[in-house]
Amino acid sequence: KVFKRGTVMIIYILVIAHFLADFTFQSTRLAYCKLNSNRDFLCHASIYAFILLIAIFPFVKFSRAIIPYIIIIISHSFIDWIRINVDKKFKGKQTITFISFIMDQILHVLILIVLYHAFNLGVETTELYCLIQQWPYFNNLVIYCLVFIILWDPTAVFIKKIFIYISNENN
């Protein structure tokens, strides 16, 4: 049984999954090793695919979610590949690597938002999602999780990159 109920919470859940997969479940070692190792790059892509899988399919009807899921996984890997190559080409140029980090994250989140709207991912949700949506504080919980996850890892990485950028600009 499919319930039709548009909700923006789906996009928040996808963004949570993105930040979990791109930061929390990607160790510092993996983040550095994927720059020079196809195996580590594929490991990161697999982690991302798995986290996104458990974020989208329990909540959005499979037939509506499968194409956006594939596009997200492919585009995420492609954007990461481009970023790795840009960072390699401009190794040591902190301005470029800082901008590539920012653009990487903006593009990933923008793709999630565009695909959410393009494929109307909030229109055909699952029975499980409709049941969870009835919890009195579900929306607040999702928003609090999103804020917490952004403040936990992505912000720490962003601040670290700002300090590296500033210290290199002063030298």
Set out the residue ranges of the language-model regions.
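Short, Lys/Arg-enriched N-terminal segments with co-localized hydrophobic residues
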Residues: K1-V8
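Structural signature of hydrophobic alpha-helical transmembrane segments
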Residues: V8-A17, I66-I74
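Interhelical loop and helix-boundary elements at the membrane-water interface
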Residues: F23-A45, W81-H117, Q134-N171
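Generic amphipathic, hydrophobic interface segment in small proteins and small subunits
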Residues: D40-V60
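Hydrophobic alpha-helical transmembrane segments in multi-pass integral membrane proteins
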Residues: I51-F57, V109-T125
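Transmembrane helix-loop-helix
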Residues: A55-S77
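Membrane-interface helix termini and inter-helical loops of multi-pass transporters
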Residues: V123-W135
